[in-house]
Curated annotation (Swiss-Prot):
Record carries keyword Transcription: no
Protein known as: Uncharacterized protein YKR045C
Keywords of the record: Cytoplasm, Isopeptide bond, Ubl conjugation
Compositional bias ranges of the Low complexity kind: 99-108
Compartment(s): Cytoplasm
Region annotated Disordered, chain positions: 24-111, 160-183
Upper taxonomic lineage: Eukaryota, Fungi, Dikarya, Ascomycota, Saccharomycotina
Principal subcellular localization: cytoplasm
CC terms in the record's Gene Ontology section: cytoplasm
Length: 183
């Protein structure tokens, strides 16, 4: 008993050393991360963040401090607000009417989009008639044997003739007699 006690204690020591290594690595990592974070009590923290965001040479900015919007897009959006804007229907309609007429003429001359629809409809009618004929035939039995009845979809077992004869010759049960009697 004492020998097994010593081996289990040795295993515990090995495990604890392994666990201590993991704990030490995580605590050193956490300590380095917490030391890199700005402390809340100082006033210089927010100004440092702003300087880091505006500094073009700053390459060590953490991902939480990077701006989400590009500086160029900010400047272009401000200039867009200052410029005059037009509504789409303020343009003169003469150019659009001509374009619409040209498109209508092209659509009238283009029969390529109609041909597949006609052929698709005719083939679908033929295929549905064809499948109906074959579906009727597929319900008929294809192979007969003494004990099995095979169709295209499944194999059904047919009981032997002796079992069928027994069911015909059995006297009616009491339950069936009581339910069929009328007063």
């Amino acid at each position: 008993m004492s020998n097994s006690h010593h081996t289990s204690q040795g295993r515990r020591n090995k495990l604890s050393v392994w666990v201590k290594k993991i704990i030490n690595t995580t605590t050193t990592t956490n300590a380095s991360v917490s030391s890199s974070k700005p402390r809340r009590g100082t006033r210089a923290g927010p100004t440092r963040v702003k300087r880091a965001e505006l500094d073009p040479d700053g390459t060590t900015i953490s991902s939480s401090l990077r701006p989400l919007v590009d500086r160029n897009s900010l400047h272009s959006s401000e200039s867009d607000d200052e410029g005059d804007r037009r509504v789409a229907w303020d343009e003169p309609p003469t150019g659009k009417v001509r374009q619409q007429q040209q498109q209508q003429q092209q659509q009238q001359n283009d029969n390529a989009s109609v041909i597949p629809l006609v052929s698709f409809c005719s083939s679908s009618v033929k295929s549905s008639t064809f499948s109906d004929i074959h579906s009727i035939q597929s319900t008929r039995p294809t192979i007969f044997s003494n004990r099995t009845f095979e169709t295209n979809s499944s194999v059904l077992a047919i009981p032997p003739q002796s079992i069928l004869d027994r069911s015909r010759t059995l006297p009616p049960s009491n339950a069936s007699n009581t339910t069929t009697r009328r007063p």
